[in-house]
């Protein structure tokens, strides 16, 4: 099974490289432009998609200007099944997005593999209303196979200024076994992480080429990194309170 899973995942990544690279580069350029102009990069996802927003937050080798919107009822630790119910509620996003400090010139990255549920769609639209440039990471194949749950009939892919396809199959899981008819081994976390890290790598390279110093964290487990990292925390803590220390 390991060979099958890795082979399929490699093919998905190769497809992203072949078909989505231009969108990734365009997204990276928008991220660079935002950061160069004191903007912040916001990320949102429900359920397992939220894991990707934390993957790139306060990350060694990652950008400091990253703000994950972590609304706990839509994560998993307060009740996994409950989070799925809430994700399907139209207008629920208004209960937490109103207070988010999203400004003109910021970038909002919204992740949802199925792309059918109301909360990610509403998050994208509210962020745009606040002036953000919206990047969507979704599966176009999966999304097209399912009816939208949003009252407008929209899918997440309808809300993005840039839409990047993670290539996930319907249901996300790619493996099957004899005498067991439920698919297993999802791919969207792997492909999503690669897409996000590629966007930010493109952004960092663009900033360097623009003679702008990218705000990149150094691993805290490397000697003499603390002073460098603390300066970045101090720079962004007002806009991204999650970076601060609450000891």
UniProtKB/Swiss-Prot annotation:
It holds the Pfam family SIS_2. One of its GO terms (molecular function) is carbohydrate derivative binding. Signal peptide: none annotated. PROSITE patterns: SIS. One of its GO terms (biological process) is carbohydrate derivative metabolic process. SUPFAM superfamilies: SIS domain (SSF53697). It comes from the Bacteria. Residues 31-214 form the SIS domain. NCBIfam families: PRK02947.1. Belongs to the UPF0309 family. PANTHER family: PHOSPHOHEPTOSE ISOMERASE, SEDOHEPTULOSE 7-PHOSPHATE ISOMERASE / DNAA INITIATOR-ASSOCIATING FACTOR FOR REPLICATION INITIATION. This is UPF0309 protein lin2794. It comes from Listeria innocua serovar 6a (strain ATCC BAA-680 / CLIP 11262).
